Amino acid sequence: MDAKRFLLRCAVNLILLENEKVLLLLRGNTGFGDGNYGVIGGHIDGDETAREAVIREAQEEVNIHLNPECIKFVGTIHRKLSHCEYIDLFFVAESWSGLLENKEPVKHVHYKWFELNSLPHNTMPLVNTAISNYVNGIFYDEFGWDE
């Protein structure tokens, strides 16, 4: 049978924590979420695990190295956009090596630490939901289906 199968996209997201604060990056010039804060993350490129993808994204975006054993999976959000669907996988890390540096200044205006319970008003709604879910122990959620 040659049925066309539905395909969805998968992204990884890193909630990087230090002293009850989360690292957020202000997006710019990406065409998606510009002017809003997001977390480290991106698409799984293929031929890599989700954990490998989040390690790669951390290196590419903020120049840090994560030990795979120190990355904890904390949740999934099934996200609906107008043109496609995503599975977003969320991980937490509280230890890393290397000095934080904005390695993608074209995509990220800057990065900043924020209290977990006091995120800026311009945090991307998906990220706001994901961080709230993490704090409240919610491991699965759906986003964008009511719009």
Describe these PLM feature segments:
Residues 129-147:
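Charged phosphate-binding loop/patch that engages nucleotide di/tri-phosphates or the phosphate backbone
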Residues 1-23, 92:
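Conserved N-terminal beta-strand and adjoining loop/helix that marks the start
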Residues 102-135:
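NUDIX/MutT-family hydrolases
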Residues 31, 79-83, 105-106:
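A short beta-turn/loop motif at secondary-structure boundaries
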Residues 9, 17, 34, 39, ...:
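Short connector loops at helix/strand junctions that flank enzyme active sites
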Residues 18, 77-100, 112, 133-138:
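Active-site-adjacent beta-strand/loop module that shapes the phosphate/pyrophosphate-binding cleft
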Residues 21-60:
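Conserved Nudix-box catalytic region and its N-terminal flanking loop in Nudix hydrolases
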Residues 65-75:
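A short coil-to-beta-strand element that immediately follows conserved catalytic motifs
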